[in-house]
Amino acid sequence: MYTPIPANTPAPTAPTSSMTSNSSSASNANTTSSSGINPRNRASGTPSNERARPASGISSFLNTFGIRQNSQTASSSAAPDQRLFGTTPSNSHMSVAMESIDTAPQQQEPRLHHPIQMPLSAQFHVHRNYQLPISISLTAPTTTDHQQSSAHNFEGNNVGNVQESLNQRQPNGTNNTTTSIISMAPAATTRNIVGGADGSTIVNNSQEMYKNLRHLIYAANQPNGTEILHLDLPATSAEESNNMFNVDEVTLKQRKDKHGLFSIRLTPFIDSSSTTNQGLFFEPIIRKAGPGSQLVIGRYTERVRDAISKIPEQYHPVVFKSKVVSRTHGCFKVDSQGNWYIKDVKSSSGTFLNHQRLSPASSLSKDTPLRDGDILQLGMDFRGGTEEIYRCVRMRIELNRSWKLKANSFNKEALQRLQNLQKLTTGIEEEDCSICLCKIKPCQAIFISPCAHSWHFRCVRRLVMLSYPQFVCPNCRSSCDLEASFESSDEEDESDVESEGDQLVDQLSVLMETSKDVDSHP
């Protein structure tokens, strides 16, 4: 309650800084001055006038700051000197601070009782060395039930106990936030979990599974790599299946890299017989995966770009910038023996393996085994393939480090002869590529000019094509004709004989001169 001050008591003078620094006090002073009341002589006024002023001005002032008007406790507990100077919490910026202090714990209390849990995918991003397994959705996000089964599959890696653990985890609430990367088990395992006793339910879940096909990469120590894939193999002979699944330890070790992962390399296949276009050109693609992994083949979109932005390139899905490739066109699969498979997932334009279509349009295909050197085509040319975005994708498949060329004795001897030739011509025993400044090693494509200088072919290719057939050496500036005709073998033999005869004549002349010099000296 407000306590009036006697008239004979002098009113204290408010500090100048308090009136100038406080914007609310200044506005309050302007309000009182406009009504004919001096704020310094406010104490000399009647109590009724003093009560009327807060009743009319405080409510409007508090509304400007969005403060509730039921803060009577704060205003009643203010000190007398604060009420006199116009700096009470009810009419100054102090009310905002006190209100925030009173209300902040109430707003933050639920957050403290329900802390945010970091998803498993975020733990992968924070980890310096990227860990496996990972899973990416290239299409629509998954549901909460799907994430519950996925989280358990990541922890257990046991297909038989998935249903029991899932029932135990159902009462607990889960986070509905969908992340771009969620660790999970293969989609085929999810099909068995969700499917009921009747076969129709399983078929419907299978259709939904391939509609939201996921990109799965497992580590090298993934158990049951072949079982979790649920392969649907075509009918083959017993001998072929025996050779496929019975791999000795030496062959299996050769198929793996130093981290125990299998690999696949895709290079563009240039069809010389095609008269219209050569297909979509792309840089060689190398992907690595552990047993039981599933690599999605699809179209490059913004969603895919955001999903793979924090994943190493060797674990990316196989995506192309072509309209004839569906968003989830198909997938590669690899089992525990290092065997690779291709599956068409209801693509509209089709998947062709060695010029044979795997399945009709909008239908699933079998898990067809792949062999080293197979030709794979995704889609068909649209509008004649005049635009690059409407061209099909043709590629050659190389499996399990088969493209790695090992330097044998012949390669090393060839490089040694090249270095000896450079030593004779330039006096330098070992010359690096003058374009990229890297060493020339065995099993590399090398271009040797007639002046005995050499470069990597990919480095000098543009210089060769720029003024072909004339070539100007960038090192010594000598010019040569790359289309110059070769001499016949007979002429070469005759030139060799003539050169050998000339050498004999020169040697004899030198011997005769030396003998004359010896005879002349007594």
Swiss-Prot record:
SUPFAM superfamilies: RING/U-box, SMAD/FHA domain. There is a cross-link at K211, K256, K258, K288, K310, K333, K343, K346, K366, K406, K412, K423 (Glycyl lysine isopeptide (Lys-Gly) (interchain with G-Cter in ubiquitin)). Residues 1-56, 69-92 are annotated as: Disordered. A zinc finger (RING-type) spans 433-477. Residues 36-49 have a biased composition (Polar residues). Residues 295-358 form the FHA domain. InterPro entries: Dma1/Dma2_RING-H2 (IPR042823), FHA_dom (IPR000253), SMAD_FHA_dom_sf (IPR008984), Znf_RING (IPR001841), Znf_RING/FYVE/PHD (IPR013083). GO terms for biological process: cellular bud neck septin ring organization; establishment of mitotic spindle orientation; mitotic spindle orientation checkpoint signaling; protein autoubiquitination; protein localization to bud neck; protein ubiquitination; regulation of formin-nucleated actin cable assembly; septin ring assembly. It is found in: Cytoplasm. Changing R111H: In strain: YJM 269, YJM 270, YJM 326 and YJM 1129. One of its GO terms (molecular function) is zinc ion binding. It catalyses: S-ubiquitinyl-[E2 ubiquitin-conjugating enzyme]-L-cysteine + [acceptor protein]-L-lysine = [E2 ubiquitin-conjugating enzyme]-L-cysteine + N(6)-ubiquitinyl-[acceptor protein]-L-lysine. PANTHER family: E3 UBIQUITIN-PROTEIN LIGASE DMA1-RELATED (PTHR15067:SF7), E3 UBIQUITIN-PROTEIN LIGASE RNF8 (PTHR15067). This is E3 ubiquitin-protein ligase DMA2. It comes from Saccharomyces cerevisiae (strain ATCC 204508 / S288c) (Baker's yeast). The gene is DMA2.
